[in-house]
Regions:
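Glycine-rich dinucleotide-binding loop and its adjacent helix/turn
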Residues: 30-85
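A Rossmann-like FAD-binding core segment of flavoenzymes
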Residues: 1-31, 48, 52-58, 84-167
Length: 167
């Protein structure tokens, strides 16, 4: 059944009644980061990319360098999909440590096993563009872990220079 809310009692009943239960959170919209350059040609949203792949419209990423921002399961899905769509290099950029990622450990390990590079303690600052206005890189700032905020390690800028990751 689609589009149906489930409480704890009903979930227990479903587990007893069925061999498998699929729960989807229904995330249908993208989360903008507010980075300068995020509207540039060559910037693709996770939802749009994964929806296209689900519709068998595989993007041809042959020879391309791809940066994926985030440390959750969706970021791992996008990174692994980019590899499978022919990307030359996939870098996962995350502002905290790998151990702080919200993605399942198996998803992180799977992304690494498929050749994705995980750049921890790396905060995105801006999307750089080339002469034609297309994405050419991701400007990032190295981070260090500071005091926890709201129960999570709080990254803050390290005293090291910004750099640009080509993508």
């Amino acid at each position: 059944e689609l589009d149906h809310s489930v409480n704890g009692e009903e979930l227990s009943r479903l587990r007893d009644e069925f061999d498998a239960v699929y729960l989807a959170i229904g995330a249908h919209s993208d989360k903008k980061l507010g980075l300068p350059g995020e509207e540039a040609p060559g910037v693709e949203s996770a939802v749009k990319m994964l929806r296209a792949i689900g519709d068998d419209e595989l993007p041809d990423l042959s020879g391309q360098r791809v940066c994926v921002i985030g440390g959750g399961n969706v970021a791992m899905d996008v990174a692994r999909s980019a590899v499978r769509c022919g990307a030359e290099k996939v870098s996962i950029v995350y502002r905290r440590r790998i151990c702080d990622m919200t993605a399942q450990d198996a998803e992180i390990a799977g992304a690494q096993a498929e050749g994705c590079e995980v750049l921890e303690l790396t905060a995105p600052l801006a999307i750089e563009t080339g002469e034609e206005g297309r994405v050419s890189g991701l400007r990032v700032q190295p981070q260090i872990i500071g005091e926890p905020r709201r129960g999570r390690p709080a990254p803050r800028a390290a005293a090291t220079p910004e750099r640009v990751i080509p993508c």
